[in-house]
C-alpha cells in the first residue's frame, strides 16, 4: 500500500489503529466491525465472503517501507524519519540476477495475510483495502500458495515448484536463542532496536520460472542445479539431507 500524499500523522495513526482492530477480529473468526450492520441504507462493515467460515490459522503481518519514513525528496512525511533503520535508508540488499520492476517494488506499508484457506486471505486484504480507501491505495499485490516453511525439526521440509525440498538449513525453533537473535529478530542494541526490537525484515521476490524447459531437463541436470538429490533432498555427495549443499 501507498499512503496518500498529504495525509497527516494523525490520519496514519487512525488508519493503523482501525487496521489493528479489524485484524484482531478477522484472526478470531469474527466479522469486521462486530455484528452485521442492520441499516440497509449503509454499506456493510464486512464484505461478507467469509461469513460463517473459520479463520483457518489466519495471521496478518504489517511492515513499513522506507518511503513511509521519508518522501522522495527526503521530507519527513509523518515525523518518524529519525526512526528509519539504516538498512532501509541505504536500501535492502540485492540478489545476483535481480531484475526489479518499479510496478512490483517498494511501497509505504506491506500487509501479508496467511491462512490455510485462500479465501480467508483474500477477505482479509480486501477488507483492509476497503478500510484504507481514501488514505491508502494498493501499489501491488501477489497471491500465493504452498505449505508453510518448516520451522521445527519435527516438520518435513516442504518442496518448491521445481520439485526440490526447499529450506532444509533454515533456522529452527530448536536452535539456540542466540541463533534466532542473530539471524531473525532485531535486538535492543541493533539499529532501530529502540522501537523495532523483536521485529524483523521482509524481502519478497517474484521468481520467473520457465517450467516447460525445466520439466524436460534430465534428472541429473536438475540435481546438479540444486546440488541435491531430488527425492530425498540430501547433497549429492552426502547421505544426510541436513548436510551442507554441494556448490
Question: Would you name each region that the model predicts?
Answer:
Residues 1-247:
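Long, histidine/aromatic-enriched segments associated with O2/redox biology
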